[in-house]
Amino acid sequence: MAQHDYRELAAVFAGGALGSLARAALSALAAGDPASWPWPTFTVNIVGAFLVGYFTTRLLERLPTSSYRRPLLGTGFCGGLTTFSTMQVETLTMLEHHHWGLAAGYTLTSIAAGLLAVHLATKLVRRVRVRR
């Protein structure tokens, strides 16, 4: 069995708690309706994708190695903020209510916008000069 660094696990836990709280706060602002676009979930997933792209590129390419930054910010915060499972439940609910176009549009737009967000964040980090 592999040894775990409990400080790294604590970083994931702390980041996950903060990300989950941020998502819950945003979700509380708007109630779900299967006939409308689920903006809270869409927003946190796209923002989370951007942040994962930003943090991953910045931490791997621009900052000194730290064993706690990636678990705290990437796995923890962004993992807690984003919610693929809620997106799936919302899509299924749309399908159950016969909102076929909305379900297809939501799924395709979520995937495309998420990929674009990661790409843009990566380009942004790589465009900024590194101070030495």
UniProtKB/Swiss-Prot annotation:
Topology of the protein relative to the lipid bilayer: Multi-pass membrane protein
Keywords: Cell membrane, Ion channel, Ion transport, Membrane, Metal-binding, Sodium, Transmembrane, Transmembrane helix, Transport
Single GO MF descriptor: fluoride channel activity
Cited InterPro entries: FluC (IPR003691)
UniProt-annotated location(s): Cell membrane
Positions with a binding annotation for Na(+): 79, 82
GO biological process: cellular detoxification of fluoride
Stated family: Belongs to the fluoride channel Fluc/FEX (TC 1.A.43) family.
Name of this protein: Fluoride-specific ion channel FluC 1
Gene name of this polypeptide: fluC1
